[in-house]
């Protein structure tokens, strides 16, 4: 299995503990997407191959953060497997609309908002984002992954990651404006 590819003994133990703790949850999440037992098992295995590459970013003590990180990776591996299975990976993205010019990935707007808004309000908005934006946003801003690392996890280009981050921030800002929270 994938554990034999890990040379460092402590990393191997950490991976094994993560696998034993989260495999059932990851399987459940993958199965909901692919609706096939074997594909769900493959998605969990493939997820751990990707997790091993980012093992240094996982803190076993922070269970909620670790859980969300592992679930996001597994869900996206399962989605990629599902899309490949039904040959949708060559279709143009339905969300590929024109980006607003006034929002950029490096915009400090959200940093300012964290000071103005309660975290629970922002968390509620993020939770309701389309998963394609939410997952990239969380991996970047909560888990601290680089665009390159996120691109590798999702099997997309860094430019696609950048677009999704910009769109996520734009959607968050629009929702806050809609709620009248922004001046």
Task: State where each predicted segment sits.
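DNA-recognition helix of helix-turn-helix
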Residues: 148, 152-178
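Structural recognition of an alpha-helix C-terminal capping motif at a helix-to-coil junction
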Residues: 28, 42-49, 64-76
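Amphipathic, Lys/Arg- and hydrophobic-enriched alpha-helical face
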Residues: 19-38, 53-57, 126, 178
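A short pre-motif secondary-structure segment
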Residues: 136-140
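Sigma70-family region 2
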Residues: 7, 48-63
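Arg/Lys-rich amphipathic alpha helix in sigma70-family domain 2
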Residues: 72-93
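N-terminal module of bacterial RNA polymerase sigma factors
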Residues: 1-25, 53-55, 110, 181-183
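Internal acidic/polar
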Residues: 88-112, 146
